[in-house]
């Protein structure tokens, strides 16, 4: 305290002139001096410690951001400053190397964390979720190994509705758990055209149909005669069939024969329709020429029967396929 007072007196004497005290200039300089001291102290306390970002809550690199030994960055203290239920986008890049990519990024308190991770190694990006917050992940390596440890890979920009991933792609000839980022040889998440790209622009409770647009996943009312079912690439959709009885011939009293038709019978539509069972994740599409599976954001598990191009499927915990159900028109 004595040192500060002595400094103030010395500064005041320095600004003393023949005409008297120039108090306005003195206080202005003193205020600027305080700001400089506070800014220098804050900048020195927030410097990085390890080469991977801020040490308080961001990404704290183990061996540098682009080292080839142990991957790029691991989650810091608080989970990447998700802000408690907010939306945090973390973009981390690691150079090519052995372990490849990223260890873990902790989510916030129920917040949603977008992670765009591009590791350049064959091991892919191994990403694990944080404390309660669901993750939309764009992870994996550039080789056939693909992602590991249950990595859910998405193509391009993920769309998160109610903490659920609606934009999922597990393409790539590598197949395996979670597919891969580019698969064996291929481009940006498609591999040898093995991945199936599914995009759902509809709202909650609806599924996007390639032919008919947004369709409700609830059973359609009986009065909607011309409403088409949800298009499913895996299952066969049968078109409506109308049944008519054979015409019968009758004779008028004056001898002129005529033909008449009996009233047509009740029409039915028999097709495979997904019966909505629980409000879980949106349809997840699995691909890859080697099959494999991927987990949805709410725990639903989709599956693929493999083959070139793969097949699409819905999470088993969300939809129950009711084959052959008849809906009266």
From Swiss-Prot:
Domain of life of the source: Eukaryota
Major subcellular location class: secreted
Keyword Heme among record annotations: no
Sorted UniProt keywords: Secreted, Signal
KW Signal (keyword) present: yes
GO CC terms, sorted: extracellular region
Biased composition (Gly residues): 49-80
Tissue occurrence: Prismatic layer of shell (at protein level). Expressed primarily in the mantle with highest level in the mantle edge and lower level in the mantle pallium.
Annotated region described as Disordered, given as residue ranges: 38-80
Signal sequence coordinates: 1-16
UniProt-annotated location(s): Secreted
Low complexity biased stretches: 38-48
Protein name (database record): Serine, glycine and glutamine-rich protein
Species: Pinctada maxima (Silver-lipped pearl oyster)
